[in-house]
Amino acid sequence: MSSFDKTMKFNFSDDSAETNVNEVLITVYDALQEKGYNPINQIVGYLLSGDPAYIPRHRDARNLIRKLERDELIEELVKSYLEQHKEA
């Protein structure tokens, strides 16, 4: 069997991606607060709609959040929530 016929598995460390998502969310949250918006409502609006108008340009928040896929953001939020609220 040729090596082209085998399914390859790609492994990478999620640590840098997780840190990046956390940093972006914190930066966006802070930017929204500084501009007087309710950060949770605005982030939820962005995640549901994909419309970047929910995120201000302040502190480059809009550009930062658009570099990440919305499903990546949701995945990290769910993962973080479950890790913090999991019963032992």
Curated annotation (Swiss-Prot):
Pfam families: IreB. Signal peptide: none annotated. Coiled coil: none annotated. Belongs to the UPF0297 family. HAMAP family: UPF0297. This is UPF0297 protein YrzL.
